[in-house]
């Protein structure tokens, strides 16, 4: 796992739902200069199509809830995967494949369990500013990727030292441009 290399200097990950606008959004994301995209699906045919059409994007699978889904996504060539919660079996399978994996956590105990298995990046879900502040305080060496946050709260989350990347869902082109500007002003 080379998570730091995967995330790079980009502080915003784009999360996209699978709908009729998916490929339009992927075009907008590419034009806006983002390259870290999480697709809310585990459909391996979809990932193959996206990876072929957008070879410069780092594509992740979101919503992984079983080891078999994780293995299928890995075999489809996704760059990373995440789950809405934490299951040791999924985390251990990701470790076996040396796969970039971001376990979802809803409690400090889940973050501790993920960290004890070697995962230094977690996705609080749901990500509230108060929960992320608590994780930042209790586990300052764990990097936090707040998920599905409100666009207007990006700067608040990025001001927490443990937050390395924020995840915004289905942004429009204006939000993409504003996100790029906001993250550049913080950096």
Task: Kindly give the residue locations of the regions a language model identified.
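Catalytic cores of alpha/beta
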Residues: 25, 66-79, 109-118, 150-164
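Glycine-rich phosphate-binding active-site loops on the catalytic face of alpha/beta enzymes
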Residues: 80-90, 123-131, 161-182
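Glycine-enriched alpha-helix->loop->beta-strand junction motifs that scaffold or abut catalytic
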Residues: 32-35, 54-57, 75-81, 96-102, ...
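Short, well-ordered alpha-helical microsegments
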Residues: 22-23, 44-48, 67-70, 87-91, ...
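Hydrophobic secondary-structure block in the mid-to-C-terminal portion of proteins
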Residues: 139-187
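Strongly charged, low-complexity linkers/loops
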Residues: 133-137
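Conserved N-terminal beta1-alpha1 strand-loop-helix module at the mouth
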Residues: 1-77, 95-96, 173-187
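Catalytic beta/alpha-barrel core
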Residues: 15-18, 34-43, 58-65, 78-87, ...
């Amino acid at each position: 796992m080379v998570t730091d290399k995967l995330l790079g200097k980009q502080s915003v990950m784009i999360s996209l739902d699978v709908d009729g606008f998916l490929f339009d959004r992927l075009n907008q994301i590419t034009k806006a200069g983002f390259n870290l995209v999480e697709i809310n699906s585990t459909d391996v045919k979809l990932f193959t199509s996206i990876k072929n059409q957008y070879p410069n994007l780092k594509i992740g699978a979101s919503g992984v809830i079983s080891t078999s889904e994780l293995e299928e996504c890995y075999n489809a060539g996704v760059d990373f995967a995440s789950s809405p919660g934490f299951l040791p079996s999924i985390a251990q399978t990701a470790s076996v494949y040396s796969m970039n994996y971001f376990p979802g956590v809803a409690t400090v105990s889940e973050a501790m369990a993920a960290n004890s298995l070697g995962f230094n990046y977690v996705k609080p879900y749901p990500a509230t500013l108060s929960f992320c502040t608590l994780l930042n305080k209790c586990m300052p060496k764990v990097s936090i990727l707040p998920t599905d946050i409100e666009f207007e709260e990006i700067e608040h989350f990025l001001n927490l030292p443990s937050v390395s990347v924020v995840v915004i869902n289905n942004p429009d082109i204006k939000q993409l441009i504003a996100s790029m500007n906001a993250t550049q002003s913080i950096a």
